Amino acid sequence: MNTLLHNKAWRVFFLVAVLVGLRSDLLFAQQIRVIATWPALADIARQIGKDMVNVESLATGVENAHGVPIRPSFVPKLNRADVLIVIGLDNEASWLPALLEVASNPRIAPGQPGYIDGSIGVSVLEAPTRFDRAEGDLHPKGNSHYLLDPVSGKIVAQNIAAGLARNFPQYQPTFQKNLTAYLAELDSRIAQWEKMAVPLRGVKFVEYHPEWAYFANRFGMKRIGSIEIKPGIEPTPNHIVNLVQQIKQEKPPLLIYGAQSPRFPEQIAAQTGIKVIRLYSSGGGRPETDSYIKWIDYTVRTLVQAVGGV
């Protein structure tokens, strides 16, 4: 009798395990396959899609924003994607178009419903009067680092919700519900960050790559110069000499760099005494920045602490 009961128990256990496994497989199969170019975009997509989406980011957050190293795994991911979310403004122009061509997925080609451009509706800063890559400028359509302004993050969330609903209209009410909740959370956090960032108002800084314009505009900081001559153009010796002289005259307390080499920041700091801070212009670069909200929070707190505000 005990053996019979034991065998029945194992059969029941096995049946339940199979059913649970099948349910998980079905759930995964039904999930919308989302590929984002950057971790911040991926996180916002997860907040909008919740359990309905399976989201992966191509970049990790520590790469040069305009030159993500291509990995073989990118192609099959793009080939299977239902939607692709990009920064836009040609941020990914140096590496993504070739990948899309090889991946050969018409659903996510530029201009198609599955291609979601996060920059739509963003108030673009530093937009040039004409489109020109002749001198290697990596911001030919304006500064693409808009996610450093959390108000722009709200616009991105709306774009992602609209893009998901465009491709999967049957789930539009769910996307809208999640969007509403996420925007409310962002509004609350933005109010907190603006209070927290009061010590940053009027603070001068130098950056390596021109990527902090949106953050500075939101929180009242003043950029006085960049190590790069133009976005993506490394400095000449004469440019460094002039920048060092400017720092000595204007005395900005901070030099911010991210994915770039520390060589020039350390060289400038040795000559001027300026404090060097490494902050990545996308979430995911540190464990504390694995969500969009955590990334902005970490960035605000780090800079406030750097100027002695906390």
Regions found by a protein language model. Give the residues of each.
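N-terminal secretory signal peptides that target proteins for export/translocation
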Residues: 1-8
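Bacterial N-terminal signal peptides
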Residues: 11-24
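Extracytoplasmic metal-acquisition and chelation regions
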Residues: 29-310
